[in-house]
């Protein structure tokens, strides 16, 4: 599935997240276990804008990191983009997180994630999110896969 678009219906089959915590609307590009580019349409209807901040709503940095982590989770799937029964992807670490641009309601947040390595059950990714081609956030992320109990 090289450079393939994947819509929300397929994302819902792959990720266990649901509203209000599903933060990937579309996969724009995908090379299995190599790289992924995803999209989040940031709307004023997101529940976190009620308190962050009512007079000047901005997307919380931790939510941008979560959107990157969900994108990274999608990247761990093979070329068939099938979820293994009972598999859950856990965010286990973050290094070098930097926030460089404020993300506002109405923005389109593009997440770009590449696999750095996979060793002893731990995936390591290089990730960055952009708005209008300007980097809003960058980080190295780590995740692992476990069977649901």
From Swiss-Prot:
GO terms for biological process: fatty acid biosynthetic process; lipid A biosynthetic process. Its EC number is 4.2.1.59. Pfam families: FabA. The active site is at residue 52. InterPro entries: FabA_FabZ, FabZ, HotDog_dom_sf. Transmembrane segments: none annotated. It is found in: Cytoplasm. Keywords: Cytoplasm, Lipid A biosynthesis, Lipid biosynthesis, Lipid metabolism, Lyase. GO terms for cellular component: cytoplasm; membrane. GO terms for molecular function: (3R)-hydroxyacyl-[acyl-carrier-protein] dehydratase activity. It catalyses: a (3R)-hydroxyacyl-[ACP] = a (2E)-enoyl-[ACP] + H2O. Its main location: cytoplasm. Signal peptide: none annotated. Belongs to the thioester dehydratase family. FabZ subfamily. Involved in unsaturated fatty acids biosynthesis. Catalyzes the dehydration of short chain beta-hydroxyacyl-ACPs and long chain saturated and unsaturated beta-hydroxyacyl-ACPs. This is 3-hydroxyacyl-[acyl-carrier-protein] dehydratase FabZ. The lineage of its organism: Bacteria, Pseudomonadati, Pseudomonadota, Betaproteobacteria, Burkholderiales.
């Amino acid at each position: 599935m090289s450079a393939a678009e994947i819509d929300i219906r397929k994302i819902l089959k792959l990720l266990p997240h649901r509203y209000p915590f599903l933060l990937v609307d579309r996969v724009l590009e995908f090379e299995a276990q190599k790289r992924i580019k995803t999209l989040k349409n940031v709307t004023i209807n997101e529940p976190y804008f009620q308190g962050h901040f009512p007079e000047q709503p901005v997307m919380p940095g931790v939510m941008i990191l979560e959107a990157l982590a969900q994108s990274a989770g999608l990247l761990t799937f093979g070329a068939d983009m099938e979820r293994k029964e009972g598999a859950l992807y856990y965010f286990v670490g973050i290094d070098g997180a930097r926030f460089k641009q404020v993300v506002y309601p109405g923005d389109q947040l593009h997440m770009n994630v590449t696999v750095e390595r996979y060793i002893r059950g731990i995936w390591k990714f290089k990730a960055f999110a952009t708005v209008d081609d300007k980097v809003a956030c960058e980080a190295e992320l780590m995740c692992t896969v476990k069977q649901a109990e």
